[in-house]
A protein has these predicted regions:
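Conserved cytosolic catalytic loops of P-type ATPases
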Residues: 26-47, 55, 59, 203, ...
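Membrane-embedded alpha-helical bundles of multi-pass transporters
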Residues: 111-127, 156, 175, 414, ...
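Juxtamembrane coupling segments of multi-pass membrane pumps/enzymes
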Residues: 2, 76, 184, 188, ...
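Transmembrane helix-loop-helix hairpins at the membrane interface
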Residues: 29, 87-243, 354, 723-725
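P-type ATPase nucleotide-binding
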Residues: 452, 456-586, 596, 608-626
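Hydrophobic alpha-helical transmembrane segments
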Residues: 136-147, 154-157, 171, 194, ...
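Flexible metal-binding regulatory segments at protein termini and peripheral loops
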Residues: 1-130, 226, 251-252, 332, ...
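Conserved ATP-binding TGD loop and adjacent catalytic N/P-domain core of P-type ATPases
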Residues: 16, 270, 344, 434, ...
Length: 862
C-alpha cells in the first residue's frame, strides 16, 4: 500500500474524481481518497512496477486538475498540522477590507447612509457608482482566485466540484455586473434615464464579492473544525520527546530521537517522556501509560519490563535498551493505524460517494433549468439570474463528503486515546452492529498467567518448605504451571531446594532427589505410584478441582508431602465487563479448552450460565465455533491473537485484547492495547456513537440540500419565501460547519461510561443462539453435533489486488457470506481463493462478492 499527498481538493466531488482517475491507471488494484487529510492510499497489483505506477498515478491526478506526490514521513506528520486555516484567515481579512466599503457603497443608501455626491444622480454619477463597485469587487475576486482556478480545472477535466459551483455563481454575478456597466454606458450615450436607472440598481457586484467572502468564511470555519478532528493524534505526537539521553561508552549523550538505534541504552529520569520502545535493564519506577492505553493508574516497571515511547516516567530513574525506534514504535503504529483508518471508506459512506459523483452536474442542470423556467414564466432576466445563482451557491457537496470521514477521524482519535484501535473505517462502523461476543478464556477473561492460589502441606512438611521444595523441582521444567510455583516462591523470597537426578515424566509429572531423598510432583495418579495419598489431601485436591483450580500433588521419600493449587486467575474487571456487554444487548459466550467443571466455575465467576459456556475446544476448533455462532447474527471474537487468529479472521469483527506493543496484529479488525475486557463494551459503545453521529451528519447533509435547493430555486415564492444569492452562500458555508461541529462532539464522548447503556434501536432482528452451540462440554454428542454439508464442488477464483493477510480475511468473509459457500481458502501470495460449494453458486455471484470489496476477479476455474 502506497500513500500519496493530494492537493487542490475542495469537496467530496473532487475526492470522487481523483478516485475515478486513479482507478483507471494500470497497476492499481484499489484506491481510497481522504478529503479530510488530503491524502490517498493506493494498492498496487502484484505485477505492477512501483516507480512506473507512481508516475502514472501522479500524471492521472494532475490530468484531473489536482496535484499528487508520494507521501514521506515528514509529509505525513506535516499533514496533521493545520496550515490551511492561517492562509484562509488572511484571505478572509483581505476580502473583508474590500467587501465592507463595497457593501456601504452598494447598499448603504438603503438605510440612509450618505454617498459622495459624485456617485449620486442618474447621469455620470451612475457610471461612477458602478465603476467604484467594480473596483472594489475585482480585488475580492483576485484574492479568492483559487475558486476560479480550481473550478475551471474541474470543468475542463469534466470533473466539476464545489469550486465550480462557486466560480459559476460568482462569475455569473460579475459578468452580469459588467453587462450592466455596458448598458449604463449605452444609456448615457442615448440619454436614456430609464435604462440607466434599471441597471444602476441591478449591478450584482456586491453579490459576487459577498458569495466569495462568505464561502471563504465557511471554508475558514471548516478548516479550523477539520483541524480539531486530529487533536487526538496531535496530542500523542507532542508527547514524544525530540531528544534522548543515550549512554555511549558509559557517557550520557543527548541525541535526536531519530538517531537512536536498536540496542542503544538510554536513560529516562523522573518526569521525562520515554523516547522509544524498549526494555528496562536497570532501575525501578512507575510509568504513566495513559497516553497510549487510557489507563489512569501508573504501571510499575522493573528490569525486564517493556516501556513504550510517549509514556511518562514518574518516580525513579530507568535505564532501558531500545527495541523499536522510528516508525516501528508503538506510538508510530498507533498514529499510522488511526491515519489509515481515516483514509478508508466506511460502508455508510458509499451512498454519499455515489451522490457526490453526480451532484455538481445535477445542480448545474437544476440551476439552468431554474433560470429558463423563470424566464418562461415571464420574470425579468435579473430575477431569473438571481434564482439560478442562488441554486448554484446554496448547493453543498462538502456536507455530504464530510459527513462520514470527520466522524471516523474523531472516533478513531477518541479510540486511540483510550487504547482502542480500529484498523479501518468499516471496523469502526460494524463493531457496533455486533449481536454476539465470543470470548476466549485464556488471556481474555483470565490473566493468562497461572498463579498459586492455595498450598496445603502436611504435619511433617509445612507449606513454606513444600513451596521451596516444589520450586526446586519445577525450576528445570518448561511447563506454564511450573512458572507459577517459581513466581510464588520468589514473591515469598524463598530459596529453592537443590534437586539432583531431575526427570520429567511426560503426561504425569516430575521427579528428582533432594538431599538424597526422592521428590515427585504431578497429578494424583502419578503420586499414587510413589505413595498413598491421605484422605485430607485427596479432599483438598477435589475441592480445588471443583473450584476450577488445578491441583499439583507432591511426595517426599515415599510419603505424601502436600498439594499446591494453581489457577489462571480471572481478571478483576471481567465480570463487570460481561455485565456491561449484556446491558448493551449482546449475547456473551465463553469459549475454553478446559474441562466442563472448570469451564462452569469460570463462567459462574463472571456471570455466565452453563448455556453460554462452550468447553473442551482446542485452538484449531475455535473457528468452527465462530462459524456456528454466526447462525445467530453478527459475531465478534475476542482473543489475545496468539492461537486464535483463524477465529478472529472468521468473525465479522475480530478483537485482539492485550496487544501491548504489537498493535498491528494482522488477524484483528480492532486492537485493544490494554489487557482489560472492559475495553470490549467500550469499543461497542464508541462504534455505536460514531454510527449515530454519521447518521445525524448524513441526515443533515441530505435534508439541507433537499430543502435549500428548491428554496433557492424559488419554489416557495408563492408564500413569500425567497433567497437571494448572498443569503444562499451564507447558508452553504454554514452547512459544512454544522456537520464538522457535530462530529467534534464525539471528542467529549467517554466510551468507558456505562451510564446510558442500552441495546441498539436499529439493528438486525435478534436471534437466539443455535442450540448446538450452547453446551457445557465437547463430550455432549447431541448439543455439540456440528452440522456439516456435503461439498459438491470446488472453484478457484483468480483475484488481483490482495496485498496482505487482512485482504485475505476480507475476501474470505465476503465469499463465505454467500449461500452455498461452505468455506474459502484465500491466498494473497497466489492471488487465488478456492471455494468449497454445497450448492451451485453462479460465477457472477462469486465475482460480485469479491469485487464489492474493491478487488478484481480475473477468472474463475471450476
Amino acid at each position: 500500500m502506497q500513500r500519496y499527498e493530494i492537493t487542490g481538493m475542495s469537496c467530496a466531488a473532487c475526492a470522487s474524481h481523483v478516485e475515478k482517475a486513479v482507478s483507471a491507471v494500470p497497476g492499481v488494484a484499489g484506491v481510497a481518497v481522504s478529503l479530510l487529510t488530503n491524502s490517498m492510499q493506493v494498492d498496487y497489483t502484484p505485477d505492477a512496477d512501483p516507480d512506473t505506477t507512481a508516475r502514472r498515478i501522479c500524471n492521472a491526478v494532475e490530468a484531473a486538475g489536482y496535484g499528487a506526490s508520494l507521501a514521506t514521513a515528514e509529509s505525513e506528520n506535516a499533514e496533521l498540522e493545520d496550515t490551511e486555516t492561517p492562509k484562509l484567515k488572511k484571505r478572509l481579512i483581505a476580502s473583508l477590507c474590500f467587501l465592507v466599503p463595497l457593501m456601504y457603497v452598494s447598499m448603504g443608501h438603503m438605510i440612509g447612509l450618505p454617498l459622495p455626491s459624485f456617485m449620486e444622480g442618474h447621469g455620470s454619477g451612475a457610471m461612477v457608482f458602478a465603476l467604484v463597485q467594480l473596483a472594489l469587487t475585482l480585488p475580492v475576486c483576485w484574492i479568492n482566485r483559487a475558486f476560479f482556478i480550481s473550478g475551471w480545472k474541474g470543468i475542463k477535466s469534466r470533473a466539476p466540484g464545489m469550486d465550480a459551483l462557486v466560480s459559476m455563481g460568482a462569475g455569473a454575478a460579475l459578468l452580469y455586473g459588467l453587462y450592466a456597466i455596458v448598458m449604463i454606458g449605452i444609456g448615457l450615450k442615448n440619454d436614456d434615464m430609464e435604462l440607466i436607472m434599471q441597471y444602476r440598481h441591478d449591478l450584482y457586484f456586491e453579490s459576487a464579492a459577498t458569495i466569495l467572502t462568505l464561502i471563504t468564511v465557511g471554508k475558514t470555519l471548516e478548516a479550523y473544525s477539520k483541524g480539531k478532528t486530529t487533536d487526538a493524534l496531535k496530542s500523542l505526537m507532542k508527547l514524544a520527546p525530540q531528544t534522548a539521553c543515550v549512554l555511549r561508552d558509559s557517557e550520557q549523550v543527548m541525541l535526536p530521537v531519530s538517531e537512536v538505534q536498536v540496542g542503544d541504552l538510554f536513560l529516562v529520569r523522573p518526569g521525562e517522556s520515554i523516547p522509544v520502545d524498549g526494555t528496562v535493564t536497570e532501575g525501578i519506577s512507575s510509568v504513566n501509560e495513559a497516553a497510549l492505553t487510557g489507563e489512569s493508574m501508573p504501571v510499575d516497571k522493573f528490569p525486564g519490563s517493556p516501556v513504550s515511547a510517549a509514556t511518562i516516567n514518574q518516580n525513579g530513574a530507568l535505564t532501558c535498551r531500545a527495541e523499536r525506534v522510528g516508525q516501528d514504535t508503538t506510538l508510530s503504529q498507533v498514529i499510522r493505524l488511526v491515519r489509515d483508518a481515516a483514509a478508508t471508506k466506511a460502508p455508510l459512506a458509499k451512498t454519499a460517494d455515489k451522490v457526490s459523483g453526480i451532484f455538481v452536474p445535477a445542480v448545474t442542470c437544476i440551476a439552468l433549468l431554474t433560470f429558463v423556467i423563470w424566464l418562461l414564466l415571464g420574470q425579468t432576466f435579473t430575477y431569473a439570474l438571481a434564482r439560478g445563482i442562488s441554486v448554484l451557491v446554496i448547493s453543498c457537496p462538502c456536507a455530504l463528503g464530510l459527513a462520514t470521514p470527520v466522524a471516523i477521524m474523531v472516533g478513531s482519535g477518541v479510540g486511540a486515546k483510550n487504547g482502542i484501535l480500529f484498523k479501518t473505517a468499516a471496523s469502526l462502523e460494524t463493531t457496533g452492529y455486533t449481536d454476539a461476543v465470543l470470548l476466549d478464556k485464556t488471556g481474555t477473561i483470565t490473566t493468562g498467567e497461572p498463579s498459586v492460589v492455595k498450598i496445603v502441606g502436611t504435619r511433617n512438611v509445612p507449606a513454606k518448605f513444600l513451596l521451596s521444595m516444589a520450586a526446586g523441582l519445577e525450576l528445570r521444567s518448561e511447563h506454564p504451571l511450573a512458572r507459577a510455583i517459581l513466581k510464588e516462591a520468589e514473591k515469598d523470597k524463598l530459596s529453592y531446594a537443590t534437586v539432583a537426578d531431575f526427570e520429567a515424566v511426560p503426561g504425569k509429572g516430575l521427579q528428582g532427589k533432594v538431599a538424597g531423598k526422592v521428590i515427585a510432583g504431578g497429578n494424583a495418579d502419578f503420586i499414587r505410584e510413589t505413595c498413598e495419598l491421605t484422605s485430607d489431601l485427596e479432599r483438598a485436591g477435589e475441592e480445588m478441582s471443583r473450584d476450577g483450580v488445578t491441583p499439583l500433588y507432591f511426595s517426599l521419600a515415599g510419603k505424601p508431602a502436600g498439594v499446591i493449587g494453581v489457577s489462571d486467575v480471572v481478571k478483576q474487571t471481567s465480570a463487570e465487563a460481561i455485565s456491561q456487554m449484556k446491558a448493551l444487548g449482546l449475547q456473551v459466550v465463553l469459549l475454553t479448552g478446559d474441562n466442563a467443571a472448570t469451564a462452569k466455575h469460570i463462567g459462574a465467576m463472571v456471570g455466565l450460565d452453563e448455556d453460554h459456556v462452550i468447553a473442551g475446544v482446542l485452538p484449531a476448533g475455535k473457528e468452527a465455533e465462530v462459524r456456528r455462532l454466526q447462525a445467530a447474527g453478527r459475531v465478534a471474537m475476542v482473543g489475545d491473537g496468539i492461537n486464535d487468529a483463524p477465529a478472529l479472521t472468521r468473525a465479522e469483527t475480530g478483537i485482539a485484547i492485550g496487544a501491548g506493543a504489537d498493535v498491528a496484529l494482522d488477524a484483528a479488525d480492532v486492537v485493544l492495547v490494554r489487557s482489560d475486557l472492559a475495553d470490549v463494551p467500550a469499543a461497542v459503545r464508541l462504534s455505536r456513537a460514531v454510527v449515530r453521529n454519521i447518521h445525524q451528519n448524513l441526515f443533515w447533509a441530505f435534508f439541507y440540500n433537499a430543502v435549500c435547493i428548491p428554496l433557492a430555486a424559488g419554489v416557495f415564492t408563492g408564500i413569500g419565501i425567497t433567497l437571494n444569492p448572498m443569503i444562499a452562500s451564507a447558508a452553504m458555508s454554514l452547512s459544512s460547519v454544522c456537520v464538522v461541529t457535530n462530529a467534534l462532539r464525539l471528542n467529549t464522548f467517554n466510551p468507558r461510561s456505562a451510564a446510558h447503556d442500552a441495546p441498539p434501536k436499529h439493528k438486525a432482528p435478534a436471534r437466539e443462539l443455535p442450540a448446538e452451540t450452547v453446551c457445557e462440554t465437547r463430550s455432549c454428542p447431541v448439543k455439540n453435533e456440528i452440522k456439516t454439508e456435503e461439498v459438491t464442488m470446488k472453484k478457484t477464483i483468480h483475484i488481483e489486488g490482495m496485498m496482505c493477510g487482512h485482504c485475505e480475511a476480507t475476501v474470505k468473509k465476503a465469499l463465505e457470506a454467500l449461500d452455498g459457500v461452505q468455506s474459502a481458502e484465500v491466498s494473497h501470495e497466489k492471488g487465488t481463493a478456492i471455494v468449497a460449494l454445497t450448492a451451485d453458486v453462479a460465477d457472477a455471484d462469486l465475482k460480485a462478492a469479491v469485487e464489492a470489496k474493491d478487488y478484481t476477479v480475473t477468472g474463475i476455474d471450476a
